[in-house]
Design a protein with these regions (language model features):
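Non-catalytic structural scaffold of enzyme domains
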Residues: 1-191
Length: 191
């Protein structure tokens, strides 16, 4: 296992430097490959925007987080997913591209909701703060996505499942981090 401090990849993300993010992930892949790993995962959804620069250079295969989500969405029969995550992720092609390969549609919250979700993630959730009003706000956003035809919501940030409760969410939830972990476990046990 190799971990990159969030501050290191965030400085690249904030500049839109996906090649810089890819360089960090490549260095990590080289370390774990050198230790004998046959594949790698990265549980940060937003960083998957760097995969187009990373994959051609990586010494080992990677499991893409959105592909793990797509597999579960297919298994459960979902056709249109609402994507929640950082603003960088929601406004990217990470989920739309992966879902399109499986004939699944995606929607994202409106611009003001994306900004507020991003603020909640970076000002509250990453700092261990989980106010009830923020939890209810996520439910409101999911209810809006449901009204736009979504039949499930992607929890596309490692911190979102810490505040969203699947038992009272307006939509079924797909926890991307858990689904990536399950995909990694499945691959590890089948090799």
């Amino acid at each position: 296992m190799n971990s990159i401090p969030m501050a290191e990849h965030m400085r690249h993300i904030m500049r839109g430097d996906w090649e810089g993010v890819a360089a960090l992930l490549l260095a990590s892949a080289e370390k774990v490959a050198g230790a004998g790993a046959s594949f790698a995962i990265w549980p940060d959804n937003t960083c998957h925007q760097a995969f187009k620069y990373l994959l051609p250079k990586s010494p080992i295969q990677w499991i893409h987080i959105a592909e793990a989500v797509a597999a579960e969405a297919l298994r459960l029969g979902f056709k249109r997913l609402g994507v929640l995550g950082t603003r960088y992720l929601m406004e990217s092609s990470v989920y739309p591209d992966a879902m399109a390969r499986h004939n699944i549609d995606c929607a994202i919250p409106e611009a003001d909701d994306r900004e507020k979700i991003n603020t909640i993630i970076f000002k509250q959730l990453v700092n261990g703060q989980f106010p009830e009003e923020s939890r209810l706000y996520f439910n409101e956003v999911m209810d809006g996505l449901k009204g736009r035809g979504c039949d499930a919501a992607v929890l596309g940030c490692t911190e979102i499942p810490l505040i969203v409760r699947p038992d009272d969410a307006p939509l079924p939830t797909l926890d991307s981090t858990r689904l990536l972990a399950k995909a990694a476990l499945h691959r590890a046990l089948s090799t």
